[in-house]
A protein has these predicted regions:
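Conserved phosphate- and dinucleotide-binding cores of soluble alpha/beta proteins
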Residues: 1-80, 84-104, 117-192
Length: 192
């Protein structure tokens, strides 16, 4: 949609041309051309991270962020970027965050796509709501099953609003944290 804001041309490559789709991430009248691909195109998940690839240093940084930034400043509403650092934070909330007594005090409201690494925090009652920029391949059934957390329409599909999420993600939250945490040798973080 950023292309359309600058008078660009938007071309959508699709597997099949149909009369109706359940949902799209941008308004249909912003799409100038629809082209059917000669063979089905595999859509890779954008935000899914294999937890086995999270390193010890990423876990350490996640623990530092949970205790030293989120806990210290009472970060309730946040926009998590993508990457292993934020995935580690999400996975540590029900264990390390719980140990610190931070449940209900941090990380209750998110502006982000539905990350699988957020599931343990959702299921353990940490996360109250998630407003998404868009979808995530493979998360459709989980999102539909949790209309109490995600914005879901009457047909069971997720409702997202990229423009609203981007605005909220930058101006209506306690903190935006990027996919790469920058911490200097003195422990100062660019995210605080």
């Amino acid at each position: 949609e950023a292309t359309k804001f600058k008078q660009g041309i938007v071309v959508a490559q699709v597997n099949e041309i149909v009369d109706e789709v359940p949902r799209v991430d941008i308004p249909g009248d912003w799409v100038d051309f629809v082209v059917q691909a000669p063979k089905p195109f595999y859509v890779e998940p954008l935000f899914t991270r294999d937890p086995a690839l999270i390193t010890d240093s990423q876990v350490l940084r996640a623990m530092m962020v949970i205790k030293g930034i989120y806990g210290e400043y009472g970060i309730q509403r946040l926009n998590h970027g993508i990457g292993f650092d934020t995935a580690a934070i999400e996975l540590l909330l029900p264990t390390y965050g719980e140990e610190l007594g931070l449940k209900g005090k941090i990380c209750s409201y998110f502006s982000l796509n539905p990350h699988p690494t957020l599931i343990p925090a959702i299921e353990s009652g940490w996360v109250k709501s998630v407003h998404s920029f868009g979808g995530e391949v493979g998360m459709e059934d989980y999102v539909a099953a949790r209309p109490d957390v995600f914005f879901v329409g009457p047909d069971g599909t997720m409702r997202s609003n990229r423009a609203f999420s981007q605005t909220a993600g930058h101006y209506a939250l306690d903190l935006f944290i990027g996919g790469t945490l920058q911490i200097d040798k003195y422990g100062n973080s660019s995210t605080a």
